[in-house]
Amino acid sequence: MPEQVQHGEDEVETFAFQAEIAQLMSLIINTFYSNKEIFLRELISNASDALDKIRYESLTDPSKLDTGKDLKIDIVPNPRDPTLTLLDTGIGMTKADLVNNLGTIAKSGTKAFMEALQAGADISMIGQFGVGFYSAYLVAEKVVVITKHNDDEQYAWESSAGGSFTVRTDHGEPIGRGTKVILYLKEDQTEYLEERRVKEVVKKHSQFIGYPITLYVEKEREKEVSDDEAEEEKVEKEEEESKDEEKPKIEDVGSDEEEEEGEKSKKKKTKKIKEKYIDQEELNKTKPIWTRNPDDITQEEYGEFYKSLTNDWEDHLAVKHFSVEGQLEFRALLFIPRRAPFDLFENKKKKNNIKLYVRRVFIMDSCDELIPEYLNFIRGVVDSEDLPLNISREMLQQSKILKVIRKNIVKKCLELFTELAEDKENYKKFYEAFSKNLKLGIHEDSTNRKRLSELLRYHTSQSGDEMTSLSEYVSRMKESQKSIYYITGESKEQVANSAFVERVRKRGFEVVYMTEPIDEYCVQQLKEFDGKTLVSVTKEGLELPEDEEEKKNMEESKAKFETLCKLMKEILDKKVEKVTISNRLVSSPCCIVTSTYGWTANMERIMKAQALRDNSTMGYMMAKKHLEINPDHPIVETLRQKADANKNDKAVKDLVVLLFETALLSSGFSLEDPQTHSNRIYRMIKLGLGIDEDEVIAEESSIAPPDEIPPLEGDEDTSRMEEVD
């Protein structure tokens, strides 16, 4: 043996690392790997790659496995040295492989890596160990690699990262085939010798590697032995001598009567000695569920996997398990939770929704590029065969492969939603939790807008307590109806009682009630559905199908009320853009509508509530208001008569302002000066109750009001005011 060692030393060759090593080490520590534990992930994934290669070669030449049929990875911590050893039965490396892959940095440097990637190279072949191998130096001060390839002798590579490495023929214990990586740990990194820590890291990063990962731990146990066995143990181990003194006690017990022989033999075996043994435990017994055939997986298995993945205490609502093959290969397992998390739209919170694996190796658990924001509630796993293992976030953003994966995931999510929609009960639960996400998708995702719009559900004027889809709405449309009518507001009750829907409902047309703030953003992008335009009943230009008689009546009303419309515009001045005759009112005297492209009253309310709103936008988006009056309403008709009799009548002016302000409120707008409006109403109440205004003024004359209350113009003519009422 000494000769062999001497012979081995004669064979030692020293090589210099290329200059890039310092830069690469810095790159690994600062860019790719902020946490040291991933060194284990990298070494395990390298071992897995080596096993993949020998398995692939054995498909065409089974004799390749003659040097070892078991394809496995072993982890052996040794606290005495202290070393952590990883052993695989993979393809191994020749001497040339060792020198090239673990010394010629350029091959696995980032620059060469990315250039080769862009040139279409096979990712798994870029460097036998690639960048990840050097992450071993995060925890080790020295690394020894012993390797045996079927086509070469057994070699040992060694380096303390001091600018050089050595390669020699290894005459130590033969490993058959494969690679053994021995890490001589730094003093402050001995935590990786602990059974608990190794298990934790393997479970986190390499739980779904396709080969068994076995942890070998030396443990002590108490063994019960008979007297004779104890003697043998004593001879074998000198440290057992101290226990000889206990033997007479056992023999004394043995001097009992014959009927107690059974007990005697039991007590003989109560002698306990400590023995050391190697405990083996497979750490990745849970095979990747997503790599299995979906037909072979039960709902219970999906449920267990979902809970282990998400820590959710409830079962998932729906699952989609699929694989994509062809130019690009990946598998995915996607889950819809039963309920939305309370912080679903909290942008600054790091989301751990979809875990990204590359060839069963965990890469990251918060990959924003993998799924659009509106699908941020989807949980699951994506396992790619094509992405490089050491991919950084910067590279992910540029990756064309990831863009294709993302497109497929979105497509499959929409398929899952459509399938779920067939089960009304479950879809109702889904919609209650995630309707905002679908509407956000309509706002953001123009490509899938049509498919998303088919998933929307709303209450309508004809749906009662149930919600209905836009497809069902279209199927119920009248022959003469060309548009889908909708109204936005705060609640179902508010919009159902709105003045805007009066005429539309009376004519038998269905109105969609949109009561979530995000609906306003949604309909800005959703201009049509199934060839039918979406028309807001609160905006100008509402056209309802009319027959000839209705058109004639409308023209007559316009001519009849033209003078009143002009007068009201003069009185209200810049408060409104125009005053017109309405075709949408039945029982209300008037309403305020907005221009086609401006904000609705509901949108204006939402924007005013934004703490960080842009006031410059508010100026032009708070659309010009149009006052529409109902020619069939007695208030409007009486007002027209008064205006025709005397257009300078102060009571007319005051009533016009009061009507306008009341219409603002009923149409969903807020008043700029609610106090003035309130004072007008109080005065009307006093007039209705017959309270003399002069008496009230006399009583209150001693108290100086903070502001002068605008007088109710023409209030001296009480009888005329009452007549209008």
From Swiss-Prot:
The keyword Chaperone applies. One of its GO terms (cellular component) is dynein axonemal particle. Monomer. Homodimer. PROSITE patterns: HSP90. In contrast to other HSP90 heat shock proteins, this one is not induced by heat shock or mitogenic stimuli but is strictly constitutive. Residues 225-243, 253-262 have a biased composition (Acidic residues). CDD domains: HATPase_Hsp90-like (cd16927). One of its GO terms (biological process) is negative regulation of proteasomal ubiquitin-dependent protein catabolic process. The modification Phosphoserine is found at S226, S255. It comes from the Eukaryota. This is Heat shock cognate protein HSP 90-beta. GO terms for molecular function: ATP binding; ATP hydrolysis activity; ATP-dependent protein folding chaperone; protein dimerization activity; receptor ligand inhibitor activity; unfolded protein binding. A motif (TPR repeat-binding) lies at residues 721-725. It is found in: Cytoplasm; Melanosome; Dynein axonemal particle. Residues 220-271, 697-725 are annotated as: Disordered. Keywords: ATP-binding, Chaperone, Cytoplasm, Nucleotide-binding, Phosphoprotein, Stress response. InterPro entries: HATPase_C_sf, Heat_shock_protein_90_CS, HSP90_C, Hsp90_fam, Hsp90_N, Ribosomal_Su5_D2-typ_SF. The lineage of its organism: Eukaryota, Metazoa, Chordata, Craniata, Vertebrata. It comes from Gallus gallus (Chicken). Molecular chaperone that promotes the maturation, structural maintenance and proper regulation of specific target proteins involved for instance in cell cycle control and signal transduction. Undergoes a functional cycle linked to its ATPase activity. This cycle probably induces conformational changes in the client proteins, thereby causing their activation. Interacts dynamically with various co-chaperones that modulate its substrate recognition, ATPase cycle and chaperone function. ATP binds at N46, D88, K107, F133, R393.
